Amino acid sequence: MANQGQRVSWGDESTKIRGRSNSRGRKINNIPLSFFNPITLQQGAKFWNSCPRDFVPKGIGNRDQQIGYWNRQTRYRMVKGQRKELPERWFFYYLGTGPHADAKFKDKLDGVVWVAKDGAMNKPTTLGSRGANNESKALKFDGKVPGEFQLEVNQSRDNSRSRSQSRSRSRNRSQSRGRQQSNNKKDDSVEQAVLAALKKLGVYTEKQQQRSRSKSKERSNSKTRDTTPKNENKHTWKRTAGKGDVTRFYGARSSSANFGDSDLVANGSSAKHYPQLAECVPSVSSILFGSYWTSKEDGDQIEVTFTHKYHLPKDHPKTEQFLQQINAYASPSELAKEQRKRKSRSKSAERSEQEVVPDSLIENYTDVFDDTQVEMIDEVTN
């Protein structure tokens, strides 16, 4: 063979002359990376029996460089302590590159099958091997791919090695976290037991005192937190009653604002029965879609009026509380009545009878309703 190499010709060679070794191959560290994805061989098949002699991948090198070899990679997996063989994988390298860069074309080597295109030069190519940061190429061939060959997609050796290392690091981190959490739990348990024993003895540690002070401070801050609704710069009809006198926002009780007794008006949302009263009020959507609406101009504004009618159960306790608030501004308050009763006790029985407010002065609002329901008509012009 000349130093410049000769062109490959398969014309006079028998297809049975395919040199190989009976060895299962050898482990080689830092194997150069192939330009191409590997081929996974069907279990039980023989690569050298199925591989065409011109089975060179397309896409790299010129006509003279279409020569090289397929290198075997044996694989296995440990299952319950037993080694389980996996299908072989074969990687392609150009002549003069890869793990057998010093080998000559057709040398008999362990796990090596030589291939070349007709007319290729049987001398080392200068194509080198793939860099670790470059992605492997998909396998493409001129001829038909044997059925025993499975062409892998982006399963290069470095990716496989990277995934294996990543899984190993992940397992190590997981085990480390597990041990750390276990140790932390043990430490916490011991600490809690010691603190509990000290507490029984009436001894408080600095940490417990700090926690107690911190909780007290939090409770103090929560008590002073301002929950007053922000009603400034809002229209009257957009304001929200807070704790305290509602006349600041809605004015004194009158024929156009006739809901609420003196206690409710003075205390707003903090009044005793406010939550129950609020439950008897229609929802926004009910008012919006279930009311009769009218509008008219009022200077530089538009006055909107709506009439809404709905029913409350007559015998429900909340209904009675609600009805007592209608036009309550025109009736004596409970506070005023109680004050009068106290004054009357210091006076004569005759004077007391004259000053006690007769029950007939308290309007009865239930006589206008039927036996089962309360019908209400609200008219809002604000």
UniProtKB/Swiss-Prot annotation:
Region (Disordered): 1-24, 150-190, 202-240, 328-362
Limits of the CoV N NTD domain: 31-153
SUPFAM superfamilies: Coronavirus RNA-binding domain, Nucleocapsid protein dimerization domain
UniProt biased composition (Low complexity): 154-163
Region listing for RNA-binding, in residue ranges: 33-159
InterPro entries: N_prot_C_CoV, N_prot_N_CoV, NCAP_aCoV, Nucleocap_CoV, Nucleocapsid_C, Nucleocapsid_N
Record keywords, A-Z: ADP-ribosylation, Host Golgi apparatus, Phosphoprotein, Ribonucleoprotein, RNA-binding, Transcription, Transcription regulation, Viral nucleoprotein, Virion
Molecular function terms from GO: RNA binding
Ranges where the CoV N CTD domain occurs: 224-337
Subcellular location: Virion; Host endoplasmic reticulum-Golgi intermediate compartment; Host Golgi apparatus
Ranges of biased composition (kind: Basic residues): 164-176
Basic and acidic residues composition bias: residue spans: 215-235
Claim: Chloroplast is one of the keywords in the record: no
Domain of life: Viruses
A GO cellular component entry from the record: host cell endoplasmic reticulum-Golgi intermediate compartment
CDD domains recorded: CoV_N-CTD, CoV_N-NTD
Phosphoserine carried by residues: S9, S156, S254, S256
Transit peptide as UniProt keyword: no
Sequence segments annotated as region (Dimerization): 231-334
Post-translational modification, as annotated: ADP-ribosylated. The ADP-ribosylation is retained in the virion during infection.
Subunit structure: Homooligomer. Both monomeric and oligomeric forms interact with RNA. Interacts with protein M. Interacts with NSP3; this interaction serves to tether the genome to the newly translated replicase-transcriptase complex at a very early stage of infection.
Cited function: Packages the positive strand viral genome RNA into a helical ribonucleocapsid (RNP) and plays a fundamental role during virion assembly through its interactions with the viral genome and membrane protein M. Plays an important role in enhancing the efficiency of subgenomic viral RNA transcription as well as viral replication.
Protein name (record): Nucleoprotein
Naturally occurring in which organism (per UniProt): Porcine respiratory coronavirus (strain RM4) (PRCoV)
Species lineage: Viruses, Riboviria, Orthornavirae, Pisuviricota, Pisoniviricetes
Gene: N
